[in-house]
Amino acid sequence: MALEPIILIPARMGSTRLPQKALAEISGKPMIVHVAEQAKKAAIGRTIVATDHNDIAKAVAEYGHEYIITRGDHKSGSDRIYEALMRIDPEQRYNAILNIQGDLPTIMPREIIHALRPLENSFTDIATLGSQIIEESEKRDPNVVKIIGTPLSQNRLRALYFTRTTSPYGDGPLYHHIGIYAYRREALEKFVSFKPSTLEIREKLEQLRALEHNMRIDVEIVDTIPLGVDTQRDLERVRKILA
């Protein structure tokens, strides 16, 4: 079956480490607008911001992007995009749903395209991205999520686990997980039906919920890592990059 993708960008106002970060100004535009612009440049399908706040919706609309207002009580971005999908597409026209975090203003369109590739394998439930860790400090940084996976090809892994620790042990590359997901529609429906899992809660990584329920996640390896904005320091770095 051919893939019919839609891009959904979850964006909430209540960030704890960097309040109102979706609206943080970067080169004259709110951060969420930068993400939406990059997603549209990928030209793979309809792009919609799913948000819980009117101020984010207004900012997105001012730059000509589509949005939908969702409930404010969602526990994860996946839950938010699922609500959005059910309301936007009850006819089930879209069978591949890309979840792009709203705090990745440096994401490149080619990386969004690459995130879809593992879904070409009909056995893959969820696709995501990773990149080899080069900086030694990142190997020990708990904010850098590592992928433990078995190689499927030169540029693809099957994920066995995700962790904040330095892993796996021994010689060989370590991979940094990039928080972009491409779900088969039925996989997203299945994922959100499960309660948060034991390891998900412990590691604070929602993708572990899928692995704990025997869902298959394949990882496309790319050359660059988009900078996620979680702190004021991250924001200042991104402002310099996009100046």
Swiss-Prot record:
Q: Which reaction does it catalyse?
A: 3-deoxy-alpha-D-manno-oct-2-ulosonate + CTP = CMP-3-deoxy-beta-D-manno-octulosonate + diphosphate
The family database entries (InterPro entries) matched by this protein are listed as: Cytidylyl_trans, KdsB, Nucleotide-diphossugar_trans
Pathway named in the protein's UniProt entry: Nucleotide-sugar biosynthesis; CMP-3-deoxy-D-manno-octulosonate biosynthesis; CMP-3-deoxy-D-manno-octulosonate from 3-deoxy-D-manno-octulosonate and CTP: step 1/1; Bacterial outer membrane biogenesis; lipopolysaccharide biosynthesis
Q: Which GO terms describe its biological process?
A: CMP-keto-3-deoxy-D-manno-octulosonic acid biosynthetic process; lipopolysaccharide biosynthetic process
Specify the superkingdom. Answer: Bacteria
GO terms, molecular function? 3-deoxy-manno-octulosonate cytidylyltransferase activity
Where does this chain mainly localize?
cytoplasm
Q: What is its EC number?
A: 2.7.7.38
Assigned GO CC terms: cytosol
Swiss-Prot/TrEMBL keywords: Cytoplasm, Lipopolysaccharide biosynthesis, Nucleotidyltransferase, Transferase
Q: Where in the cell is it found?
A: Cytoplasm
What is its biological role?
Answer: Activates KDO (a required 8-carbon sugar) for incorporation into bacterial lipopolysaccharide in Gram-negative bacteria.
Q: Which family does it belong to?
A: Belongs to the KdsB family.
Name this protein carries in UniProt: 3-deoxy-manno-octulosonate cytidylyltransferase
Underlying gene: kdsB
